Regions:
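Acidic, low-complexity, intrinsically disordered peripheral segments
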Residues: 2-4, 29-57, 148, 296, ...
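C-terminal motif of bacterial Sec signal peptides marking the signal peptidase cleavage site
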Residues: 25-27
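Periplasmic alpha-helical coiled-coil/stalk elements that build and connect Gram-negative outer-membrane
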Residues: 29, 206-324, 440, 444, ...
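Bacterial Sec-pathway N-terminal export signals of envelope proteins
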Residues: 29-135, 139, 303-340, 398-399, ...
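Short amphipathic coiled-coil heptad-repeat segments
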Residues: 58, 65-69, 73, 78-83, ...
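Small/polar, glycine/serine/threonine/aspartate-rich low-complexity segments that form flexible
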Residues: 84-95, 141-175, 305-315, 347, ...
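Amphipathic alpha-helical coiled-coil scaffold segments and their short linker/junction regions
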Residues: 102-107, 163, 259, 264, ...
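Sec/SRP-type N-terminal targeting helices
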Residues: 114-115, 131, 166, 180-208, ...
Length: 529
C-alpha cells in the first residue's frame, strides 16, 4: 500500500520558523525575576544598578556672596544666578549669621523654593502651550522609498504571464492647519491655564512663607537649646560648689558621708544633663542648617538673638486678624485661582459640544520614477517631478461618541465642586489657625512672665540655700533641691521666650503677613495675564 507524500506549501514552510521563533522569544520575556525573590527579606541588587548621586548633588559647589545687612534688615544681593546649582554662602564665614541672613540663605538654597519655582514656571509654560492652539500649525513630512510590484497578465500579452514594476519615489509634504472658530473652547483652555499659573505663583509665595516660619522656628529652638546648655553649665558649677562645701564640712566633722555622696550624685546628674543639653543643641543647630539648605556639617556660627522686647498680643482684634488672613493668605488665593480655573474647564468642556471650523492647506510633490518589465519589449523608465497643492475649509462636529463629551462635562463640574469645597475647607482651617495662633501667643507670653518670676525666685532660693549649707545652717537636701529648681527655671525661661517669638511668627504666618512683600490684588480677575 502506498501513501501519497503530502506537499507543504512554501508559505507554510516560511511561517513555521517564524511561529517557532515567536514562541521562543515570548518565553524569554518573563521579567518576574526583576522583582524581589521573597516577601520576608529586604531586596538587595545582585549587581551594580548604575545609580549614583549626580556630582552637583553629591558635592555641591558653593557660591560666595555678601553677608552684609542694610538698615532695613534685608540682606544684600549675593553673587549668584537664580538658576545656579551651587549653594550660596556668605563671603565672610567667620562672622556669625543673624536671623535675616539665615532667612535669605534659606530662600536661596532650600530645594523647596526651587521645586515651587519650577512648578510655577511649568504652569507659565502651560499658558504658552495652550495659546499655541490659536496660531497656525505647520507640519512638514517626507517619505521616500522603493517598491516592487507584480501584476498577472494573459499569455497573449506577456509570455511569462505577469509583469513587474520597480518604482522609487519621494513625497515631501507641507500641511497647514489654522483654527478659525471653536465657540470659545480654546479661549477657555487658555484662561484655565492662566488661572493655574496664578495658583502656582501663590503656591510659590506660600512655600516661601512656610520656609521663613521654619527658619524662625529652628533659629529660636537653637537659641533655646544654647540657653539650656548655659543653664546646664551653671548647674554643674553650682553642684561643684555644693560638693566642695560638703567635703569641707565632712573634713571638719560637720557633715555625713551621705551628704558627700548626695553632692557627688547631684554633680554627676548635672554633668549628664549637660551632655544631653549639648546633644540637643547640636541637633537643633543641624536642623537649622538643614532648613537653611546648608550641610549639617558646615562650620557656621549662629548669632545670638539680640535683646529686644517680647512680641505683643492683641486679643480683642481676632476678627481683624481673620479678615486679614482671608485677604492675604497665598494658599487661600491659590484655592480661589483653582476655582476660577475649574470654571473655565467647565466652559471648555461645554464648548466641545459645538463644531470646530478650521482652514487646512497642503503643498506636496511627487518625485520619482517607474520602470516596467514583462511586456515583451523593453519599456523606457518614466519619471515625474510635479508639485501638488490644496486648500480646504474643514468643519468637524462629532455627533455621537458614546457619552464621552457628556461625561467630560460631568467630570469638569465635579472638579469645580471639589475646588469650591476645598476653598471652604481651607477658609475654615485658616480661621482656626488664626484663633489657635492667637491663643498660643497669649499662652506663651503668660508663660514667659511666670518663668521670669520663677527664675528670680529660684535664683534667690539657690543663693540662700547654698550659703546656708556652706555656713552649716542648711541641709544638703535643701541646697540640692534649690540648685535643681534653678536649672529647671532657667530652662523654662529659655524655652518660653523662644516659644513666644516662635508663636508670634506663627501668628504672622497664619495671617499671611510673614513675607516682606505682600501685595495681593483685590480681585483675581485683575491679575490674570
Amino acid at each position: 500500500m502506498y501513501f501519497k507524500k503530502s506537499r507543504i506549501s512554501p508559505m507554510t514552510r516560511l511561517s513555521l520558523p517564524l511561529i517557532a521563533a515567536g514562541l521562543i522569544l515570548s518565553g524569554c520575556n518573563d521579567t518576574r525575576d526583576l522583582a524581589p525573590e521573597r516577601a520576608d527579606r529586604a531586596w538587595h541588587p545582585h549587581k551594580s544598578t548604575g545609580l549614583s548621586l549626580p556630582a552637583s548633588i553629591r558635592s555641591p559647589s558653593f557660591t560666595a556672596g555678601s553677608d552684609g545687612v542694610n538698615a532695613g534688615g534685608n540682606t544684600s544681593a549675593l553673587m549668584t544666578r537664580p538658576d545656579h546649582p551651587g549653594m550660596v554662602l556668605p563671603e565672610n564665614q567667620d562672622r556669625a549669621l543673624s536671623l535675616p541672613q539665615l532667612i535669605d540663605l534659606a530662600e536661596r538654597n532650600n530645594p523647596r523654593t526651587r521645586v515651587a519655582w519650577e512648578a510655577a514656571r511649568q504652569a507659565a509654560i502651560g499658558v504658552g502651550m495652550s495659546r499655541a492652539a490659536m496660531l497656525p500649525q505647520l507640519t512638514f513630512s517626507a517619505m521616500g522609498g522603493f517598491q516592487r510590484m507584480a501584476l498577472p497578465l494573459p499569455n497573449y500579452l506577456s509570455s511569462r504571464g505577469y509583469l513587474t514594476s520597480n518604482g522609487a519615489a519621494a513625497f515631501p509634504k507641507l500641511e497647514l492647519d489654522y483654527l478659525l472658530l471653536d465657540f470659545g473652547r480654546t479661549r477657555a483652555q487658555i484662561n484655565e491655564a492662566k488661572y493655574q499659573t496664578l495658583a502656582a505663583n501663590f503656591g510659590f509665595s506660600a512655600v516661601h512663607q512656610q520656609l521663613i516660619l521654619d527658619v524662625i522656628s529652628a533659629y529660636h529652638a537653637q537659641q533655646a537649646a544654647q540657653a539650656i546648655v548655659a543653664a546646664s553649665h551653671h548647674a554643674v558649677e553650682n553642684m561643684a560648689i555644693l560638693l566642695q562645701s560638703a567635703q569641707s564640712r565632712h573634713d571638719h566633722g560637720e557633715a555625713t558621708i551621705i551628704d558627700v555622696a548626695t553632692a557627688q550624685r547631684n554633680l554627676a546628674q548635672a554633668r549628664f544633663d549637660l551632655d544631653k543639653a549639648n546633644d540637643a543643641e547640636h541637633g537643633a543647630r543641624h536642623a537649622l542648617l538643614e532648613v537653611t539648605g546648608l550641610p549639617a556639617t558646615l562650620p557656621l556660627a549662629i548669632d545670638a538673638m539680640p535683646a529686644r522686647a517680647l512680641p505683643r498680643s492683641t486679643p480683642g482684634q481676632i476678627r481683624q486678624l481673620v479678615d486679614q488672613a482671608l485677604a492675604s493668605r497665598p494658599d487661600l488665593m491659590a484655592d480661589i485661582a483653582k476655582l476660577r480655573a475649574s470654571d473655565e474647564a467647565v466652559l471648555a468642556s461645554k464648548a466641545a459640544l459645538r463644531p470646530r471650523v478650521a482652514f487646512a492647506g497642503t503643498a506636496s510633490g511627487y518625485l520619482g520614477g517607474l520602470k516596467t518589465y514583462g511586456t515583451g519589449r523593453n519599456a523606457p523608465a518614466s519619471t515625474i517631478a510635479q508639485p501638488e497643492a490644496g486648500a480646504f475649509l474643514q468643519v468637524s462636529w462629532p455627533i455621537y461618541q458614546g457619552g464621552l463629551r457628556a461625561n467630560a462635562i460631568h467630570m469638569a463640574e465635579s472638579r469645580r465642586d471639589e475646588a469650591e469645597a476645598t476653598l471652604l475647607k481651607d477658609r475654615l482651617s485658616i480661621e482656626r489657625q488664626v484663633a489657635d495662633s492667637q491663643d498660643a501667643l497669649e499662652t506663651a507670653l503668660a508663660q514667659v512672665k511666670s518663668a521670669e518670676v520663677l527664675n528670680r525666685a529660684a535664683q534667690t532660693a539657690n543663693d540662700g540655700a547654698t550659703q546656708a549649707y556652706a555656713h552649716g545652717v542648711g541641709t544638703m537636701t535643701d541646697a540640692s533641691t534649690a540648685a535643681a529648681a534653678l536649672f529647671e527655671a532657667q530652662a523654662a525661661l529659655a524655652v518660653s521666650t523662644a516659644q513666644a517669638f516662635t508663636k508670634a511668627a506663627a501668628l504672622a504666618h497664619a495671617t499671611g503677613q510673614l513675607d516682606l512683600v505682600n501685595n495681593v490684588p483685590d480681585t483675581l480677575s485683575d491679575s490674570v495675564p
